[in-house]
Amino acid sequence: MEVYPAIDLMKGRAVRLYRGRRESVKVYGDPVKIAQGFSELVDKIHVVDLDGAFEGRPRNLEVVERIIEETGLRVQVGGGFRTYEAVGRAYEVGVENVILGTKALDTAFLERLTDEFGGITVSLDVKDGRIAVKGWVEEGSIKVRDAFEILRNYVNRFVYTSIERDGTLTGVDEIGRFWGDEEFIYAGGVSSAEDIVRLAERGFSGVIVGKALYEGVVKLEDLLEVAKCLRRG
């Protein structure tokens, strides 16, 4: 089990949203300083370009580049990666994993990326059992398990994001394992060490934690200790 602290970016600032709603934004400050704090405890973080997700193209890659240069952290980033050029630019600035959302359902595009780049990850952004699209603004028609059965032919690394839980601090979804040996990372509502234990029991290999850290609901050190114990078995 791995723990990935999250930084969501909007207009160059670190923010959090409630259930992905733009009007619910809460600002937490300088993302580079926040990343520097995380770098004392972890070597990899999760970054979301919210402007990119809403607008359809990355808008905060310069901030991501600064985070990498000034902290040495490994970074996985999502938000608006819908062209080959945008994905390529992210890898140029030093990103380790580019996370695709909506565009991953274009399997010709996905295949081209996986042929060219390593570390491509797909985010299954779920609401009511279906994949949400266009920055979570629209609910899609495809069921999450149907999407997974298609996408698993191209990638083996996924993020499962519960939109209804995101930013709520209400705990994690009750999800029955529907994947095999693919790497699955959970995001949405994580607010305690017990959540991490439950997710590990369901087969998740990683967890993304955001608002619970920013609001002081849980300490990153405590989550990392639990994750270490889980890895030991």
Curated annotation (Swiss-Prot):
Q: Which residues form the active site?
A: 8, 125
GO MF annotations in UniProt = 1-(5-phosphoribosyl)-5-[(5-phosphoribosylamino)methylideneamino]imidazole-4-carboxamide isomerase activity
The family annotation for this protein states: Belongs to the HisA/HisF family.
What the entry lists under CDD domains is as follows:
HisA
Q: Which gene encodes it?
A: hisA
Catalytic activities: 1-(5-phospho-beta-D-ribosyl)-5-[(5-phospho-beta-D-ribosylamino)methylideneamino]imidazole-4-carboxamide = 5-[(5-phospho-1-deoxy-D-ribulos-1-ylimino)methylamino]-1-(5-phospho-beta-D-ribosyl)imidazole-4-carboxamide
What's a Pfam family in this record? His_biosynth
Give the top-level enzyme category: isomerase
Q: Which domain of life is it from?
A: Archaea
| Protein name in UniProt | 1-(5-phosphoribosyl)-5-[(5-phosphoribosylamino)methylideneamino] imidazole-4-carboxamide isomerase
